[in-house]
Amino acid sequence: MTHHSLKHISDRIKQALNQIENRNLAQDLWYILGEQNFQGFLPAFTVNHFCEKYHMTDKELALILLPVSACYANPTISHFSVGAIAKGESGNFYFGANQEFCTTNIQQTVHAEQSAISHAWMRRESKITEITVNYTPCGHCRQFMNELNSAETLRIHLPHSQDNLLHHYLPDAFGPHNLQIDNRLFDKKAHNLFLITEDPLIQAALDAANQSHAPYSKTYSGIALQLQDQQIFQGSYAENAAFNPSLPPLQTALNYLLLNGNEVENIARAVLVEQPFRLSYRGMTEELLAYLGDIPLDYIQVS
C-alpha cells in the first residue's frame, strides 16, 4: 500500500510549519512534536504554555495548527486534505485528518472530524468541548458529532467563523434522544464482555470492545493492532443514531495508529473481538486489512 509514505510525517510537518508566520512558535512546535515522535497530540500544559508565551487564545492556536493537523491526512481518493483539532474537557488538543483507502469501498473512509474525535476517545478523553476544522463540516460529520455527550454545548471553529454551536449547523436534529438512548459517545460503558487470555493483543481488543458505543445494534466490537516493534493500538466501534455515520473499529484503530506518527505498513497482527448481535464487522475488517497488505485477522466471538 502506498499511503502517503513518499514523505515521512516529519517532512510534511516541517513543510507546514514553514508556513507559520511566527518563526519562534514554528520552532517550538517542531521541537515539541519531534520530542514526542510526531504524535498528533498536545497536552493541556503545552497548549497553555504556547498560549501564555505567544499571547494567544487556545482557539487561535488551534486555527494555526490546522495545516499541521492536515499533514496526517491520507487523501488517496480525493487528494483533498482536511485537518481538525478536537479540544477535550481536559484541555488537551487531539489532531485529526481524513483517511481514505483506494480500491476498497468509499464507506471505509474516515472524515477529519471523526478522526480527531475518535483519536481523543482512544486516548480516554471524557468529553469534547470544541472542534476546529479548516473546512465547514459535512452533513456526515455533523451527524457523527451529534452522538457526543457534549453535542448540545459543542462549539465549532472555522477559519472564517468561530464559536458556533453544533446545532447551528444541524438544526432540528435527529439523534440518540429520538431512539430513547441516554448513553452517548464518550460516556463510560459497562458491557462486561469476558475472555480468559494471557495474550496482550487479545486483551487489548477485548478492552476496546468493552469500550465500544453500540446502543442501537448491541454489537460490541473492538480491535487491536500490533506493530512489528510490539506497539499496540486499539480501536472501538462508534455507532451512530443515523447508522451510516458510524465508525467501524478498524478505522478507529488505523486512525489512532496514523495520528501517532506510525505507518500501516508496520502492522504485524490484528485481533477483532466482537459480540455480533445484529451486525458483524468481520467481513469489512478483513477486506480493508487485505488492502493494507494481506494482514491476517484473528476473529474472536464473545457472548
Curated annotation (Swiss-Prot):
The active site is at E113 (proton donor). GO terms for cellular component: cytosol. Keywords: Hydrolase, Metal-binding, Zinc. Its EC number is 3.5.4.5. GO terms for molecular function: cytidine deaminase activity; identical protein binding; zinc ion binding. It holds the Pfam family dCMP_cyt_deam_1. Gene3D superfamilies: Cytidine Deaminase, domain 2. Substrate binds at N98, Q99, E100. The keyword Hydrolase applies. InterPro entries: APOBEC/CMP_deaminase_Zn-bd, CMP_dCMP_dom, Cyd/dCyd_deaminase_Zn-bd, Cyt/Deoxycyt_deaminase, Cyt_deam_dimer, Cytidine_deaminase-like, Cytidine_deaminase_bacteria. Transmembrane segments: none annotated. The keyword Metal-binding applies. Its cofactor is Zn(2+). It is an enzyme of class 3 (hydrolase). GO terms for biological process: cytidine deamination. It catalyses: cytidine + H2O + H(+) = uridine + NH4(+); 2'-deoxycytidine + H2O + H(+) = 2'-deoxyuridine + NH4(+). Binds 1 zinc ion. This enzyme scavenges exogenous and endogenous cytidine and 2'-deoxycytidine for UMP synthesis. Homodimer. Belongs to the cytidine and deoxycytidylate deaminase family. This is Cytidine deaminase. It comes from Histophilus somni (strain 2336). The lineage of its organism: Bacteria, Pseudomonadati, Pseudomonadota, Gammaproteobacteria, Pasteurellales.
